[in-house]
């Protein structure tokens, strides 16, 4: 595990502020919205569809804390772009939007360095003000929308209206207290991690924040490599993974196979009270990966000689299957959902940090074993020579 302290020169202009929103392209946005609201504690924020004059695409916007998800679907059978995306990738993340300052400058610099500009800067406005946008191509079919608010005071963005329907079930469910996006992870095919991470360094002036390789993260069967990139202020963190050769197909390779290439593997959501959050998410019916009781037996032994003290009750962490990683300065608590669609692709993480800025490297081996158990149930913990071939295709 390597942590990098050199952030490079501070960009002259074009500051990246934070994650703005994540857009999912799904087959049925209305039903996907219901899942994230009922299972995960999101609430409707805004809507754009036929009733608001949007004739091609419907979008339901949901929010929890500072986390904003946009669930979008095609309205017409001739929408080839969204149709092809769904056939290839299934339901998943299409766009990660960043709120920025000086969108024009960022686009100009990215273009000079060779980035593919999917859509040049444009401005939209309504009675609440103006917003400038631009769209850049990153790994796979994923895009980044740059969002520059020009004194905009609306709830979301121009063109969206308040949702017409509020599900009466939602206020009766326990609060989940998820507060903000901590990081968003992209999986790459083998040998593409470095080029994908370098894209951010070159085009967006991000820097390397953290990395691990397959000598540090491996099981008997599989392994991974990961590089985390971040903006100068380190308010946006983007881990980039790739599979590493092993005896069996890794969970990263399984993702790449079923996603049809690179894409967003998971979104980590930060909380200040993970025990309450996970208890309530489990009560709502969200499914999580399980880890064996031996993990907690070993954890109790290791913590006896650790320089830090975990404030949370270890029995409660074991009951909820929450993982702990730590160093001499602090610790983090984390847990991962099972895939949130039928394809074994996108899943979510809930994380709580106590003076610890890592990504759970100490848990990677335990997690990989948990992932491998799930892979085995799906018939996908196969020999490496079958890599790249999705069963039945």
UniProtKB/Swiss-Prot annotation:
Pfam family, one: Glyoxalase
Record field: catalytic activity: 3-(4-hydroxyphenyl)pyruvate + O2 = homogentisate + CO2
Known EC number: 1.13.11.27
Gene Ontology molecular-function annotations: 4-hydroxyphenylpyruvate dioxygenase activity; metal ion binding; protein homodimerization activity
Subcellular localization: Cytoplasm; Endoplasmic reticulum membrane; Golgi apparatus membrane
UniProt keyword terms in alphabetical order: Acetylation, Cytoplasm, Dioxygenase, Disease variant, Endoplasmic reticulum, Golgi apparatus, Intellectual disability, Iron, Membrane, Metal-binding, Oxidoreductase, Phenylalanine catabolism, Phosphoprotein, Repeat, Tyrosine catabolism
Cofactor binding, note field: Binds 1 Fe cation per subunit.
Obligatory cofactor(s): Fe cation
Residue(s) carrying N6-succinyllysine: 132
Name the record gives this protein: 4-hydroxyphenylpyruvate dioxygenase
Species this chain originates from: Homo sapiens
Organism phylogeny: Eukaryota, Metazoa, Chordata, Craniata, Vertebrata
